[in-house]
Amino acid sequence: MISVFDIFKIGIGPSSSHTVGPMKAGKQFTDDLIARGILHDITRVVVDVYGSLSLTGKGHHTDIAIIMGLAGNLPDTVDIDSIPGFIQDVNTHGRLLLANGEHEVEFPVDHCMNFHADNLSLHENGMRITALVGDKAVYSQTYYSIGGGFIVDEDHFGQTNGSAVEVPYPYKNAADLQRHCQETGLSLSGLMMKNELALHSKEELEQHFANVWEVMRSGIERGITTEGVLPGKLRVPRRAAALRRMLVSTDKTTTDPMAVVDWINMFALVLNEENAAGGRVVTAPTNGACGIVPAVLAYYDKFIREVNANSLARYMLVASAIGSLYKMNASISGAEVGCQGEVGVACSMAAAGLAELLGASPAQVCIAAEIGMEHNLGLTCDPVGGQVQVPCIERNAIASVKAVNAARMALRRTSEPRVCLDKVIETMYETGKDMNAKYRETSRGGLAMKIVTCD
């Protein structure tokens, strides 16, 4: 089963597939060198990056992420403030300390970090890392970053994801989940909690939920006090801090009901600005869509009822259940299915989680998730300049409001829906596979070709 620990992972920006995954791959490679007993023999490491991972790699800091992974770092624990200085050192000296300083190798970046526009055979996000002794390659591994920070090596590509431990209520689709709920009388969150307890202790789960929510809230608090311009050639100004000041100073929520929308926008904008700046965020289910699930929960916390341990667990469990359906039966990779697999999935997850907190039945929860995705079908991934900024940041805000609307529509529906969640997931995947590669995180089409970056 794909666990809540798999869907919600603490990491760094700006991208789960292009930053978090590559860093994990770099770390895995040096772990393999240690396990094989050859780390201290290596004189040079060469990295080759392919497809979408290459085409938008510079804007997503893929090269930096791989280097930091080779150096022994992981996304959830890396010291973000130390990264610029470390990379400057590597660029200056052409040397790289592997595995937390265990061994130093040659690494002239211009020759050891190579970008290739063509795809490897199995996925759009491919990378190959090779260790050499002199001019002889002694170990090489190919990795694919398949979305949401998940990586898989070539030998294990296509194998079942998630834990092999038997859970009380196994499922492959939304129909299975609804059937289990109907037979047991459990809510969807209650059902998922029983599955999670087969994998983790109650204390572990509660701690994970608390850690995830703390990172989300810390991102909001950090972002609303930070202004200036985001990194990169686009020179995109941060907007969330100014928007919050405006909201706090006017406090029109009592006279203008639509002011709630402004708050939801602010919550989403601030987290995606933090992500774009390379800050600490939570994959939900990806970094490119990291603002939606927390923005909707922050809306609930501020305007409906203060979030407590119980409501936090219910929201996270349901959102991760929906995310797992897309992970199992479609994709959460923008390079594979476009932005519908990132922002669309996050919208679906958040809509379902909110519906659960608002008292929805399992069937209504799935309707909310279906609405959230149905109206993101065909959404392209065309980041300007290869950066997770335009249109990504605003898109998270729009999708957050859409998720709230989807949950409310599901709760107030009196007729049977014509489209079920499983069919919309199937449609999303087919649509993504039919989508021209220009619109799947390559920055070769759409807005990416219409907006001129600043020098």
Residue ranges and their predicted role:
Residues P75-T253:
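C-terminal regulatory domains involved in ligand/effector binding and gene-expression control
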Residues M1-G13, R36:
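An N-terminal structural lobe/cap that precedes and organizes the functional/catalytic core
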Residues I7, G11, I264-N272, Y315-G323, ...:
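Short alpha-helical scaffolding segments that buttress acidic/His motifs in well-ordered protein cores
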Residues V307, V318, S324-A397, M409-R418:
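Hydrophobic alpha-helical bundle architecture
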Residues H200-G338, G446-D455:
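Accessory "access/gating" subregions that flank catalytic or transport cores
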Residues R418-D455:
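Extended hydrophobic packing segments that form well-structured cores
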Residues F8-G26, A277-V296, V337-C347:
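Conserved phosphate/anionic-ligand binding catalytic regions in large, soluble enzymes, centered on
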